[in-house]
Amino acid sequence: MIRLVGKRGKGSFESQLDEAAKGKEFVQIDCTSDNTDKVMREGLSPFYIGPVECYDGLQSQTFESAWQCAKLYPNSVIDDCVDANRHPAPGYFAWRDKFWAKRYPEDFPNKSEIRFPAGRGNANKCIGAWWKVNGTFERLDYIPSRKAIYIPVYAKAVVKTEAYRRLVELRDSGKNLLLIDFDGYNIHHPKYNFTYRDAIHCWRLRMGHGFVLAMLLEGLIRVENGEVKYADGLMEETNREYSPDLRKLTEEEKLIRGAHEGGVTLEEWTALSLDDRRLLKKAAKTENAHARGFTKAAWMRLPVAEKFAILCGER
């Protein structure tokens, strides 16, 4: 049995277990940089694991920097980061390359710098992530970047480590594994009652590397000849409605939720006035889409300019 629990404000590990897991004996595995076992710490923590392959032959010395420095920010945060189209400008590449070349801990004065390379106070100002997907560079929103960057890059790196080999040996010997991560939670707990597919596509909750480890150990993800393979349906979008009481939303998550409900990108949503946001959210309701001759899915796929052209024609 594999279970994942969180370290950050989620109560005791025992309280996070579901009924099927309670009473079982688990081997506890701290997947973070707090692990006192050097092999496990440096083989599982995103701060240490690396070098990792990115794109076009480029490497980042740590997975954490690969992920954090794929993100784009306004020029007010990183000088000359993006051009008028919100694509990377020279300042972005200089910033990215600087951090991709650093090793942890020797090149970082503290954990905060590797975790927040644009500054702790700027984390919620990210306007997307820049990555090469199927041969084409794209600026990715929250969930697409999770699927195109976070999951596959970590999976390909971690399976090469001695730490992961130890986890596989424990699993294959019949041990129950309790993975512990800052951004983890037990999908089987009644509070969530998720599948891993739900967790991947849930914009309301963070998805830490512990989830990738759990999916690898459960056989939902595998790495074959350097390529990541997924169980059928795992990466397909879900229309599941998530319980509003999971936890209080951050300001960043409120924006992400609004963009999701309005059927636009996070960047487009951020640029809209409050009145236009309300208009888009109302128009995206199933009954209103049908009234305009669209299915909800078809309406959501329309470019934002086309949506407003239709809506403005009704005014």
What role is predicted for each listed range?
Residues 1-314:
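Charged, low-complexity intrinsically disordered segments
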